[in-house]
């Protein structure tokens, strides 16, 4: 359910793992939108 949680979540270790996975899958993370979410887990970078 919460598979596409943003990197701004309380658990930073999970955020780091997700970022690494994002890089491994060759998927760019939306770092310019103030949110570091993997586009693979989020249909579109959620800007909030």
Swiss-Prot record:
Organism superkingdom: Eukaryota
Gene Ontology terms: biological process: chromosome condensation; sperm DNA condensation
A molecular function (GO) term: DNA binding
InterPro entries according to UniProt: Protamine_P1
Keyword Membrane: no
Keyword Nucleus: yes
Protein name: Sperm protamine P1
Organism: Monophyllus redmani (Greater Antillean long-tongued bat)
């Amino acid at each position: 359910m919460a598979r596409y949680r943003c990197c701004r979540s309380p658990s930073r270790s999970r955020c780091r793992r997700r970022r690494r996975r994002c890089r491994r899958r060759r998927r760019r993370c939306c770092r310019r939108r103030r949110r570091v979410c993997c586009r693979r887990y989020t249909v579109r970078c959620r800007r909030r």
